[in-house]
Amino acid sequence: MILSSFLKIERMSSMHELKFRDLNVEVNEEDTVLLSMTESEIIVLTKKEIDYGAKYINHIVLYCNTDGRFLNSFSIQTNEQVINVQKVDDSFLFLIDKEYEDSVRDVEPNIYLWNPIEGFHQSFYAGRYINSMIIDQNKNLWVGYDETGIFSCVDQEISTRGINKFVLKNGKYELYFHGVSSYVIDQYFSTFVSEDAIYLYYRSMGEDYLQKLNLLGETLERVEVGIECSSCIKNGSSIYLFSRDDDSYNIEKVFKTNDMQNYVEQKISNENNGESLCFTQVASYKDKVAGIDHNNKLFLLNNQSL
């Protein structure tokens, strides 16, 4: 968590709490876990190496993101490691971990679509060194890149934009060739989806920004953010930033703001017993948040505590 010197952080004697419900789901701690969300679902993917890393078994479990009910589960084998998973309609999008040679153009597919009926049915190249991806309300795929991809020095490399949008046409994703952001992006962190907007979170010229777009992709505002956040939700006029601790790298605090300069610190707690929670990862979509704590238990935000 990095705080800019001009910010005002309010720490109240009786700190407001964001309460999370224990879904009584324990994720297998021996497996690597990926967590993501859609409009209606929590996606938990656990992956396990087999054949000394030559293959991977990816076990996906879906839960309802309003009440935590179990919805479905799938097991998919891949030859390469999955590092991000999203879902559109009945298809899952798997981002594959891939190394790239410096200054050498390589457009081999790194995103694969799979569904229970067709199996793997589409693949495409989405840029090198992808740092984040999410699907918005209109089924557009937003892909952001780390600085290695942005400054890759490869001719016609799409990663150099910092952020790209892929649109779904006739059941297939295609690159939206118009620029998403007119600002210089040095490092892209994440994309957040709210009820009526898209938020791009990135670093430009040494400062971190949230750029708000409407659903047509037009910029509405761009504000400097003084707190590093791993996830973000919007409720009414308030924005909640989930921040990682610099030392433990766990998510233990939330900062609420209406203007990106004045923040109220809030704790994360278990609604059943009031104990503080410490998340290793969180995922958000609109005003929904799910988290996995240090005991590998799955929690869902009680939105009445916002």
Curated annotation (Swiss-Prot):
It comes from the Bacteria. Immunity protein component of a toxin-immunity protein module, which functions as a cellular contact-dependent growth inhibition (CDI) system. Neutralizes the tRNase activity of cognate toxin WapA upon expression in E.coli. Does not inhibit WapA from other strains of B.subtilis. The WapA C-terminus cannot be expressed on its own in E.coli, however it can be cloned in the presence of its cognate immunity protein gene. Cell contact is probably necessary for growth inhibition. This is Immunity protein WapI. The lineage of its organism: Bacteria, Bacillati, Bacillota, Bacilli, Bacillales.
